[in-house]
Amino acid sequence: MSLSPLFVGKSFGDLPGWSDDDHSAAFAAFHRSSFHVLTKPYRNGALGVDFSAFADAYAEARTVSPANRSPILDRTEARAFFERHFIPTLIRAETGGAGLVTGFYEPQVEASPVRTERFTVPLLSRPADLIDIDDSNRPPGLDPYLAFARQTPDGPVEYFDRGEIERGALGSKGLEIAWLADKVDAFFIHVQGAARLAMTDGRLARVTYAAKSGQRFTGPGRILSELGEIPLAQVTMQSIRAWFKAHPDRVDEILWQNRSYIFFREADVEDAALGPIAAAKVPLTPGRSIAVDRLLHTFGTPFYIDAPTLTAFDAKPFRRLMIAQDTGSAITGPARGDLFAGSGDAAGEIAGVVRNAADFYALVPRALVSGSNR
């Protein structure tokens, strides 16, 4: 596998703010991936960053453990680690211009283990009749986009969509994991793919993505913009929530236009400082994990993100080393990323306003770059 010409070799001196970053925080995220790959290697992305080329970096990372080092590495040591094993390469958007970053987070909401007068909106587990679909079992006539379907005696068919499910299509199957008080809260948990649940019985629980109904995602921001309700430039999670609060009678009308429905599984909250286990099978690190297009990029790849207009994280231009540890259906293209802001309302305030141009510097293993003496 050869490295895509989309990667343009640079030096670390070309990266704005590189020497000022806290590389130890990025190393902690990379360190978690280094142990997971012993169980299951990451799949190679189509742009040619071969997983096997990470072997030396992962092996060295695994020699450092919290048991013998705290912090795992200091900032200087972590910076030297990344400079020793990787070469920075600038990767542009398909248009040839800068890339785009948005933000995501793990909501935390109050929930009940049982339905009550107040808690009436369920989060559902994966139904038994929801099956994975690919070209090996897709029947003629089924939308080729669909990766999930409903198994019937006559074969796979398109699964129930959001409107059908919320009108009761699965109401008798006992799939309810927990009950929420607000349908809009539930929808944004679907968008984020995970949540912490402050249960009324005193427990702190977590749900994470298990599967989906399979239809295309249609964001409410786009719908409200096309209806003339919110100018496109003003669409944020906060503005969408405010519109729903002002128009409670139209919530179903808007949300049911997004036919995609998410199913969840229960998970433990093992470390309150970390997010949920994501697509790369490691817990997300606030401010250091990034979701990328997994068809193009290889999980575990470090990305240095230069987004000078983004100041929501710490009131300074966003220039940070991130580790590719998640993906998302809206995250497509070589220079497109979703930054994990953390858990809870404060993280949501950050994530909801992130939509900024950014330069993406993929740090690729030196073995993949000819003449890698930069």
Model-derived regions, located:
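Secretory/export targeting leaders with adjacent low-complexity proregions
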Residues: 5-268
